[in-house]
Amino acid sequence: MPDARLLRLAASLGTRDEGAIRAAMEGALGADPVAVEEVLLQSHLFVGFPDALNALGLWREVSSIPASPSAGEDPRGWSERGRTVCSTVYGSNYGKLRDNVGALHPDVDDWMATGGYGRVIGRPGLDLVTRELCVAALLAVWNVPRQLHSHLRGSLNAGATVAEVDEAVDIACGYLGEDRARAVRELWDAIRRSAKRMEDSNGASPDAPVHDTRG
């Protein structure tokens, strides 16, 4: 089961409220500091560099833990890894995603696959299931239903169980008002029902991960 402290931290980033983020960081002081950093580092893909930099600065203040060493990866491996990770997250919708984003702008398509999934989401330090659950928790609070849909489904595609996504949604909804929380839960319920129909047709367990990336 992914560390709930990481999910709470990710969700708090969507509030843009320093008090909420600080409280989540204080709650995460006992978590793996590398994992905490990875949650903060990947957040720049969704909340932008300014908020991510501010969050990293706040973490240094709250934790007094120095930055971990650079991953020192060879960028030449990011393109292939990005395609692999992105196709895992999007499953059968991967080709359609690439076509749609490429139609918006071909450079954005490359930035998404190579930069987003190859450079960031696929990097070491945090497993893909936890990364996707953290992304979903953040996006639920950030209020972007289309992208939230993709990453709730992507969490299942990466190997999260329904119970694990339930937890991420519950944590995120703790930061939301009644109407927003209801909308998030309704979206997740629709995705869960769709996944259940697919699992039933394939003869899988109702709570089995679609594709477990945790080894």
Where are these regions (language model features)?
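Acidic, glycine/proline-rich low-complexity segments that act as flexible tails and inter-domain linkers
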Residues: 1-5, 11-35, 41-128, 157, ...
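A structural feature that tracks compact, well-ordered secondary-structure segments
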Residues: 12, 23-27, 124-125, 135-158, ...
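Residue-level detector of family-conserved "landmark" positions at structurally sensitive sites
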Residues: 36, 165-166
